[in-house]
């Protein structure tokens, strides 16, 4: 399934350029996250299998002809499970120098040989985002079937090779008190960490035992201010935000990479 991000659509009519393409390569994922559409609505997966199947190389080539930047990020799949993912990655980096590649993954289920090749292809224009929701030993509480400790080893390995990576950390009830320690751990290995609010609690009456509380809800408050302000371009407050014992600057973006001050 290939989607064009309409908020970032940029046609130059004489060249027919699409600025960003978001690609969901198929329907496969090894995890069973409680609030994922895969878990809650398995009929969607069956429909997608019948209707779309997996992205084929011939179709991917068409995307490369038009898209400047590529994001591999599954709504119902994880890109690393596509059997041709390394081929797609190799094809992408051979295109013009201005092309950037973003890969979002839970990072679990591939053998070392696969990662060796993936990271060898990722030295320049590729940025990986690993979803590790909590400290390595606790991420599986939401990302069911994930071995967070092995994913953390893969992340450290990637960093040691000079690969660009980000640690994406979604606050939940079980991990909100681990944020300080996670920030220290990320800093120790010089890995940027991003706190990202889950939108899947909206209008929901189940899984409330997972919903974070206290200071981490500043993300919800900030989004509320943005949506309800007369000035739709309202910027986040410039003062520091305190989460646990760690303070963060909040300029630029609601979902920015958070770096300890």
Question: Whereabouts are the PLM-identified features?
Answer:
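Conserved alpha-helical substructure of the radical SAM core
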Residues: 2-127, 138-149, 153, 189, ...
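A cross-domain feature marking catalytic cores of carbohydrate-active enzymes
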Residues: 74-76, 103-107, 130-134, 169-171, ...
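Short, electropositive alpha-helical surface patch
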Residues: 88-92, 128-131, 176-196
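Conserved strand-turn element in the central/C-terminal portion of the radical SAM core barrel
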Residues: 155-178, 198-200
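Flexible glycine/acidic-rich beta-alpha junction loops that bind and position SAM and/or redox cofactors
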Residues: 174, 194-223, 244
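C-terminal accessory extensions appended to soluble enzyme cores
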Residues: 237, 244-251, 255
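Active-site and channel-lining beta-strand-loop segments
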Residues: 256, 260-261
């Amino acid at each position: 399934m290939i989607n064009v991000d309409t908020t970032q659509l940029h046609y130059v009519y004489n060249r027919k350029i699409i600025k960003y393409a978001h690609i969901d390569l198929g329907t496969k994922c090894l995890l069973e996250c409680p609030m994922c559409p895969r878990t809650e609505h398995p009929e969607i997966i069956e429909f997608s299998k019948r209707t779309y199947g997996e992205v084929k190389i011939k179709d991917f080539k068409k995307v490369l002809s038009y898209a400047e930047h590529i994001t591999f990020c599954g709504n119902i799949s994880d890109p690393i499970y596509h059997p041709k993912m390394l081929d797609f990655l190799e094809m992408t980096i051979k295109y013009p120098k201005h092309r950037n590649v973003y890969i979002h993954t839970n990072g679990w289920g591939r053998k070392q040989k696969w990662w060796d090749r993936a990271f060898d292809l990722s030295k320049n224009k590729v940025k990986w985002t690993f979803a590790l929701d909590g400290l390595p030993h606790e991420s599986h509480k939401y990302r069911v079937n994930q071995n967070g400790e092995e994913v953390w080893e893969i992340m450290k390995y990637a960093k040691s090779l000079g690969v660009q990576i980000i640690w994406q950390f979604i606050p939940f009830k079980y991990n909100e008190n681990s944020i300080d320690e996670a920030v220290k751990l990320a800093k120790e290995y010089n890995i940027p960490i991003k706190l990202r609010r889950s939108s899947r609690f909206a209008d929901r009456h189940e899984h409330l035992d997972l919903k974070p509380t206290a200071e981490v809800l500043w993300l919800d408050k900030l989004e509320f201010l943005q949506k309800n302000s007369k000035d739709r371009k309202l910027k986040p407050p410039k003062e520091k935000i305190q989460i646990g014992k760690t303070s963060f600057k909040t300029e630029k973006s609601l979902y920015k990479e958070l770096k300890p001050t």
